[in-house]
């Protein structure tokens, strides 16, 4: 037991001066691991870095929800890609269709891919796609009914939308 304590003490004395370099190496390794993970993700999902615009625009071609793509690929199924174009002339998009027609998937795809781009992640869409950077991304997910405040699902969504509209650019 004394020998173990002596060995560990000697080891600690030897390593202690190297702690800053070890921590720096650890941070560098974490950064390399992150870059490698992004590259692997890009390969798995055929993701690219789209052309970034200095204006608020979405001009997406064959955009695909990456998590859905990976999930369906396990069953040899493919995701239906979507094209979206929003710009200063065409600022509103109405999405309609039957139940299970892809409306929610479309909205989730837009939100996720926009967020991914703004985090510096590659996204699965055609290389000729263009994407603007937005100062805010707002999301209203789920049912936020409040019995105490007497808010229905619909009025809760309206309250959230009001806050978003006041804060958006």
List the predicted regions and their residue ranges:
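Alpha-helical coupling/stalk and coiled-coil linker elements that connect catalytic or binding modules
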Residues: 1-100, 105-109, 114-136, 159-160
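Switch/coupling sub-region of P-loop NTPases
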Residues: 133-169
């Amino acid at each position: 037991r004394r020998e173990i304590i002596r060995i560990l003490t000697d080891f600690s004395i030897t390593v202690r001066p190297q702690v800053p370099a070890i921590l720096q190496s650890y941070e560098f390794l974490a950064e390399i691991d992150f870059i490698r993970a992004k590259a692997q993700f890009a390969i798995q999902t055929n993701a690219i870095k789209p052309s970034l615009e200095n204006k608020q625009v979405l001009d997406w071609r064959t955009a695909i929800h990456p998590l859905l793509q990976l999930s369906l690929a396990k069953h040899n199924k493919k995701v239906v890609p979507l094209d979206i174009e929003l710009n200063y002339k065409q600022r509103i998009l109405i999405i309609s269709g039957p139940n299970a027609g892809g409306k929610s998937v479309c909205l989730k795809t837009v939100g996720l891919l926009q967020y991914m781009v703004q985090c510096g992640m590659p996204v699965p869409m055609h290389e000729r796609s263009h994407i603007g950077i937005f100062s805010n991304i707002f999301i209203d997910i789920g049912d936020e009914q409040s019995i105490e405040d007497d808010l229905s699902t619909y009025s809760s969504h309206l309250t959230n939308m009001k806050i978003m509209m006041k804060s958006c650019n």
